Every structure is written in C-alpha cells, then in structure tokens.
Amino acid sequence: MPKPKDKPFAIPKPMVREAYRRVAANKGAPGVDEVTLGEFEADLENNLYRIWNRMSSGSYFPPPVRAVEIPKPHGGGVRVLGVPTIADRIAQTVVAMYLEPLVEPRFHPDSYGYRPGKAALDAVETCRRRCWKFDWVIDLDVQEFFDTVRWDLVVKVVEAVTDCRWVLLYVKRWLAAPLQHPDGTLQERDRGTPQGSAVSPVLANLFLHYAFDQWMARKFPGCPFERYADDAVVHCKSRRQAEYVRDKIAQRMREVGLRLHPDKTRIVYCCDSSRRGEHEQASFTFLGYAFRPREAVNGRTGEHFTSFLPAISPEALKAASDRLRALRIHRRTDLSLDDLARWLNPIVAGWMNYYGRYYRSEMYPLLRRVSLYLRRWAGKKYRRLRTYKRFKRWWAGLLKREPGLFAHWRWVRAF
C-alpha cells in the first residue's frame, strides 16, 4: 500500500490487510458490483489502499447490499440474505475485528452463535444435558429479528462498549445501506441488519446480550438458557414457572422493539421414563435437532428405557434429502470412482459430523439413499454392472479393497 498521510481516523493498515485475509478465507459470492474475489485480488494493493484511505478519512459510504433468498438452516423456510461487495465485506470486517475483543469478555457463556471457540453443537450438548435436569422448556422464536431490530438500540449497545468515532460512524452507515433486489430495485430500510454482512453477527450478539442474556441472568438466574444468534431455549422447573418466564420474556422483547412469534414460541414438557406427566407439547427443534422422547439402552444393564434426546429433525432431514437429490449423483458419469468420492465425501461427511453426533440411526435412511444413488451411477458408468448380481459382487469387492472410499461407509454399507 502507498505511504499513509494524516487522517481523521487512525485505522491501522495491517488491520485492513488482516480483514482481507479473513474475507478471502471465507470466499463468498460477489455483491452488487459483481466483482469476484479473484477480480478484486487482481489489483489487490490499490483496492486495499482505497478501502483504508476512505475509511480513515471518513469518506467511506457502503454500496447497496445484494438481496438473495436462501433456505433457512436445518430446513426452516427461507430468509433474505444480504451479500455485500468484497470491498464492503473487508470494511465491515475491520469494524468487527475492532469490536470482537471488546465484547467477547462481556458475553454470556451460554451465547454460542458466531463466537470463537463455540459452536452450534456445543449449544445442542448443553441443551441435551439440561433437558435431563429441568422438566420444562420454553422454545423461543424471536419473530424476524434480523429484519426488525431497532437501529437506535443497536447504536446504543455499541456505544456501551466503545466511544470510537469511526466505528460508530460506519455502523450507522451500514445499518442504513439499502437492499438491492434481483430486478435492480432498491429497498430502503428503517430497521434491521441484513444477515450475511460481516458485522451483523457481532452487532446481533451485542444487542441480544443486553436485551436477553444479561436480562435473563439478572431476572431469572435459576432458569438457564442456550442462545445461538436469535434462536434460544430456556429451561424451567415447572409449567407454572415456564408460563411466567415466557410472558416476562415476551414483555422484555416488546420493550426492545421485538416480538416473540405467537405460534412458534412454545412450552414443552421433557417427558421420559421417570417423567410420565402429559402435556400437549413434548418435542421441540433447536439448531436442526429434534428433542423428544426416544428409546434408549442402558450401557451397563442392557435395559431399555425412554429418554429425552436429540436427533436430526425431520426438517433438516428433508433439506439434506433434497440436497442429495439435487446433486444428481447418478448422472456424474464424467467422474471416475475416486473423483466421485472426492466430490461427494465433504458433503456427506458434513451431514454426519453435525447431525450424527446424537442418535445417528435417524440418519441411516439418508445414508442408504447415498448408496442407492451410487448403485445407479455404477450402472450408468459400467454397463456390465447393470444386473443386481454383478453389481453386488462389485460392491462387496470395493468395500473389501477400499473400506474408507466413501464417507458414509463408516456407518452404513448396505443400500
């Protein structure tokens, strides 16, 4: 980068370069300017200097954010994702990097989303253990959090952790950046922070830290919770307590400009062999896992009993099945067997690593479908394998020679 001059804002150049490295590592699609990461890197030094120069002088104004509809994680409908330009992503990452060391020490230990050293499966595990200790759960659904969060309160929580002028300036500008839809129309907004931006996760966590986490710890210290971004579960000792806490949370959300979804926020009874009471709701979904009564086996005695356990949710299973179908594995006869495995394994292993942590047998039908698609692929690729007898012999030989060729063979080898 060229030599710096005095600027109103002291933003270190190495910070901009590190922000670029993080953006480059995540890759991602181009924004409204249609500039890809590769095109940005073709003139990297000048592009990074331009970002630093404009941010340091206070003259950086974010372009519109490209609006893209994407399926919600774990098969929960669709939401609008905001895709910033590569340059804007780097600028946002600079601010996120400034805020993260300030806010991380403040955050509640049961806030799991978008935080270093924490993951969704950590939240699932904590929830699993607490469902054994607490009989009741409040399954919270904050309605359209990322679309409705109030800008003035977002700025207020940022001001609570820093008085850095350039951070506050650019947070305000990013909040006000319009969405550009596929037809080119611009949607001006007066609230919300688009998902997909580099700075949204830290802003969302900071907002909910004050709006929910800290408030819960102060008002209801005996009701532990797990929160991943705007998805949260609260544990209670009795139905009466759960109803009271739910109503107080709803009131708190109204105070900060949010709403609990009236239909999706539910009180659930964690019934099992030792908790035989009845309630209209005995299951809930959290981070792609369906928690409900399931058959379990005592490892020491072999005794069967009912436990309240998580497993891949029907919605997540359908989303994975739809993705599997869309891959059209049986049509990829242009690939060799080894190349097919290299292409397919990261996808299947991703499902197994996440959804197979608990009650993995719920995934077996999906993994058997992978084998069925492989059978169809083999029949199209090799004419001699079109009869079942010949295919079965080939399959058995392949399993013996290369037992680790396909990721799902660790758990399921039949079809």
PLM feature spans:
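Non-catalytic terminal/accessory segments
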Residues: 1-415
